[in-house]
Amino acid sequence: MKSSIFVACFITFIIFHSSQAQTPRENFLNAHNAARRRVGVGPMTWDDGLAAYAQNYANQRADDCGMIHSDGPYGENLAAAFPQLNAAGAVKMWDDEKQWYDYNSNTCAPGKVCGHYTQVVWRKSVRLGCARVRCNSGWVFITCNYDPPGNYIDNVYGDLEEQKPDFDSKLELPN
């Protein structure tokens, strides 16, 4: 009797925890939406077409894990790390660029990059698709695509409502 109660409890535990586990798409989406929520930007939705585009490109990078943009029609962030990188880690790397973003001048600090961060929180980018691949080298490559794309010069980050809701944008991005 005790063993059947134990088995029933164990099965219930497994079912409960497996139902609570997030899928990779939920991990990417939740990490992005948490970063956006912190600065007052609405949530994104997952787009299977963007995810397929991202997966196709990630598969192309599996041989070299090269941090080379796809030059596609979408906004895009790339990340790579060894030996592990997950959705939360990639989005954290991009979100951490916030420290170098100056709201008053609407620019990145000299010599720093913040374009990944601005793409994550770009208000008009409302659809997201991401993919992850383990490269032949053992590194992990992640790409996220955004639609509509963000980071347009003269309109970069200009509609974010954290400190300056109605300011003109003049963010200078590195070439």
Curated annotation (Swiss-Prot):
<feature type="disulfide bond">
    <location>
        <begin position="130"/>
        <end position="144"/>
    </location>
</feature>
<comment type="similarity">
    <text>Belongs to the CRISP family.</text>
</comment>
<keyword id="KW-1015">Disulfide bond</keyword>
<dbReference type="InterPro" id="IPR002413">
    <property type="entry name" value="V5_allergen-like"/>
</dbReference>
<feature type="signal peptide">
    <location>
        <begin position="1"/>
        <end position="21"/>
    </location>
</feature>
<feature type="domain" description="SCP">
    <location>
        <begin position="29"/>
        <end position="146"/>
    </location>
</feature>
<dbReference type="InterPro" id="IPR035940">
    <property type="entry name" value="CAP_sf"/>
</dbReference>
<dbReference type="InterPro" id="IPR018244">
    <property type="entry name" value="Allrgn_V5/Tpx1_CS"/>
</dbReference>
<comment type="function">
    <text>Probably involved in the defense reaction of plants against pathogens.</text>
</comment>
<dbReference type="GO" id="GO:0006952">
    <property type="term" value="P:defense response"/>
</dbReference>
<dbReference type="GO" id="GO:0019953">
    <property type="term" value="P:sexual reproduction"/>
</dbReference>
<dbReference type="GO" id="GO:0005615">
    <property type="term" value="C:extracellular space"/>
</dbReference>
<keyword id="KW-0611">Plant defense</keyword>
<dbReference type="Pfam" id="PF00188">
    <property type="entry name" value="CAP"/>
</dbReference>
<dbReference type="InterPro" id="IPR014044">
    <property type="entry name" value="CAP_dom"/>
</dbReference>
<feature type="disulfide bond">
    <location>
        <begin position="108"/>
        <end position="114"/>
    </location>
</feature>
<feature type="disulfide bond">
    <location>
        <begin position="65"/>
        <end position="135"/>
    </location>
</feature>
<protein>
    <recommendedName>
        <fullName>Pathogenesis-related protein 1A1</fullName>
    </recommendedName>
</protein>
<dbReference type="InterPro" id="IPR001283">
    <property type="entry name" value="CRISP-related"/>
</dbReference>
<keyword id="KW-0732">Signal</keyword>
<keyword id="KW-0568">Pathogenesis-related protein</keyword>
